[in-house]
């Protein structure tokens, strides 16, 4: 009975730690889905042509290397 309680508390503690870590890493720009996808696609044979900042863009084509904000490529 004691072992079962200890295991339940340990699982709940580890689950809470995972949820806390997931919430903290969500807002980091260096781990965004777009950057992860670009990292997988950028090999020696694939080169991506990026639009310059403040160029017109849309969400479907995604030619901006950063983000498309209000139909304009952003800086950073």
From Swiss-Prot:
Disulfide bonds join 50-65, 57-68, 64-73. It comes from the Eukaryota. The modification Pyrrolidone carboxylic acid is found at residue 49. It is found in: Secreted. Residues 23-46 form a propeptide. Expressed by the venom duct. The lineage of its organism: Eukaryota, Metazoa, Spiralia, Lophotrochozoa, Mollusca. GO terms for cellular component: extracellular region. Belongs to the conotoxin O1 superfamily. The keyword Signal applies. Its main location: secreted. The presence of a 'disulfide through disulfide knot' structurally defines this protein as a knottin. GO terms for molecular function: ion channel inhibitor activity; toxin activity. Residues 1-22 form the signal peptide. This is Conotoxin ArMKLT2-0211. The keyword S-adenosyl-L-methionine does not apply. Keywords: Cleavage on pair of basic residues, Disulfide bond, Knottin, Neurotoxin, Pyrrolidone carboxylic acid, Secreted, Signal, Toxin.
